[in-house]
UniProtKB/Swiss-Prot annotation:
PANTHER family assigned to the protein according to its UniProt record, in alphabetical order: 30S RIBOSOMAL PROTEIN S10 FAMILY MEMBER (PTHR11700)
Descriptive protein name: Small ribosomal subunit protein uS10
Matches recorded under InterPro entries: Ribosomal_uS10 (IPR001848), Ribosomal_uS10_CS (IPR018268), Ribosomal_uS10_dom (IPR027486), Ribosomal_uS10_dom_sf (IPR036838)
One of the record's GO molecular function terms: structural constituent of ribosome
Taxonomic source organism: Albidiferax ferrireducens (strain ATCC BAA-621 / DSM 15236 / T118)
Keywords of this entry: Ribonucleoprotein, Ribosomal protein
Family under the similarity heading: Belongs to the universal ribosomal protein uS10 family.
Assembly information from the UniProt record: Part of the 30S ribosomal subunit.
Function of the molecule: Involved in the binding of tRNA to the ribosomes.
Length: 104
């Protein structure tokens, strides 16, 4: 029984517009080369919150609150061809998007 090869791509970014644009570009490239794409699946957004004192000396009750949201998407490319791998390697994505690629 032959096992099908699968490429799992995980995208992370602080801006959801950039990540959606990158995901659409990856899906379009993979479909153009004849691969089957599952996704993009939106994963839960991670929130990091920081509380910082406004005053350097007194007024502990006065604080600023900041947060960083990390958006994530997951895609699987099932049974990729050599053309698919070459096209994905040549793909130019925005600088704000972190890409993790696993071959399974």
């Amino acid at each position: 029984m032959a096992t099908k090869q699968k490429i799992r791509i995980r995208l992370k970014a602080f801006d959801y517009k950039l990540i959606d644009q990158s995901a659409a570009e990856i899906v379009d490239t993979a479909k153009r080369t004849g691969a089957i794409v599952k996704g993009p699946v939106p994963l839960p957004t991670r929130f990091k919150r920081f509380d910082i004192l406004r005053s350097p000396h007194v007024n502990k009750t006065s604080r600023d609150q900041f947060e960083i949201r990390t958006h994530q998407r997951l895609m699987d490319i099932v049974d990729p061809t050599d053309k698919t791998v070459d096209a994905l390697m040549k793909l130019d994505l925005p600088a704000g998007v972190d890409v993790e690629i696993k071959l399974q």
